[in-house]
Amino acid sequence: MNINLTMFGQLIMFTMFTWFCMKFVWPPIVMTMEERKKRIESGLLAAERGRSEQEEMQAKAQEMINQSKDQAAEIIANATRQASNMVEDAKDVALKEAGKVKAQAQAQLEQDTIQTRNELKNQMSDLIMQGVSVVLAKEVDVKVHQKMLGKLSQSLS
């Protein structure tokens, strides 16, 4: 056999093998590679979307936390204001009640003072009557009367 003929035969076989591979083997391999490429691209896009959605959700969560903190601070401020108002109202009520109690005590003191003065006047009038009856029981003497009235005034003061 001739080397050229062998080479020519191998060239024909290689061409047929290449044509067969290009016609029947290569398209499924290329199609499988394209499908995998598309699947990988869609996976990467989904991962990127997931990452961006995660960042958005984290931003929203942080915003909600900040809003909650602001609301909590506002609630605390309102509660503090309300508590101070309640304390002020209680102080006002206590001062009014203290004023009433003071006025009642003052009125009671004045009433007791008047009652004591009346009792003292009654006792004084009794003592004066006793002194007058003693003076009248004895003889009417100016010197003696002045001494008795002096003793009476000393006993009264």
Curated annotation (Swiss-Prot):
Its main location: membrane. InterPro entries: ATP_synth_B-like_membr_sf, ATP_synth_b/b'su_bac/chlpt, ATP_synth_F0_bsu_bac, ATP_synthase_B_chain. GO terms for molecular function: proton-transporting ATP synthase activity, rotational mechanism; proton-transporting ATPase activity, rotational mechanism. Disulfide bonds: none annotated. SUPFAM superfamilies: F1F0 ATP synthase subunit B, membrane domain (SSF81573). Coiled coil: none annotated. One of its GO terms (cellular component) is plasma membrane. Keywords: ATP synthesis, Cell inner membrane, Cell membrane, CF(0), Hydrogen ion transport, Ion transport, Membrane, Transmembrane, Transmembrane helix, Transport. Belongs to the ATPase B chain family. HAMAP family: ATP_synth_b_bprime. This is ATP synthase subunit b.
